[in-house]
Amino acid sequence: MSPGRNVDDPAAMPGAGRSDLRGWFPMVVILLAIILSLFVATTGGADRLRVVTIGDSVAFDGDPGIRAALEATGAAQVDTRSFGGVGLLQPGFDDYLDDILDNGPEVVVVMLGGWDLDGLVADPAAYGRRLDDVADRMAGRGATVLWLGMPPAPPREGIEAARQVANGQFVALAGRRSDVRYLDTGLALGGPDGGFTRFRVGLGGTVVQVRKVRGGWDDGHLCPGGAALLGDLVLGALRADHDIGDPSERWWEDAWTSDARYDDPPGSCDASAD
């Protein structure tokens, strides 16, 4: 006679072992998530478009907006390398560029010119050759270039004529090279006539301050509203040439807008449009 089932044996109970499996499942999911996050962290998101920004102090103010716009798509990784005093004719630029290119960017976003104006205006042809040399070095590392023009300047600075000469050089560079694309920053930061403005309609559809105020006077540097508009301009250009989807909603209101650079000098981005 076969022994009967021991009803006191847990293994003999209906569904025995299922609860143990159900207990392990969440742990497996968590472990896989950790492995995936470690992979992304160590590879830096190898499938994302590698972008670097370079330029002067105006570009420095624009960098957080460019980074926010591009990274909000999940398809780009942005290294921001702009700082005050950068120019093609300034000491140390070649070493600065080599260091940036050593990281293998696929796209280089450039915005500069203010520190080059004296030499540029004095000898535009020589500056054009310098532009070609710099573009050759970027292309030689496999990068394409988005060259942003100098934004409209406050009339008080008295550099508008020189700015036009500089932007003419950047336009000409893009015209003779397939690996360089020129972007008109006046479209993003200018008023209705493309000239300087302190305020304009921002990405949220309301009027925002786009340029700083310094000592009560208009200044050429950017506020978060201007940086966001610049980021949107760059994103639009990249999406024309790369498979990049839509950014997350209202990325222009994220934490980057509280960066300390937008309160330098204090209150510079707190002007009222009234």
Give residue spans per PLM region.
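N-terminal Lys/Arg-rich, disordered targeting/topogenic segments
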Residues: 1-19
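C-terminal region of N-terminal signal peptides and the immediate post-cleavage residues
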Residues: 35-49, 64, 242-245
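Catalytic His-Asp segment of secreted/periplasmic serine-dependent ester chemistry enzymes
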Residues: 154-274
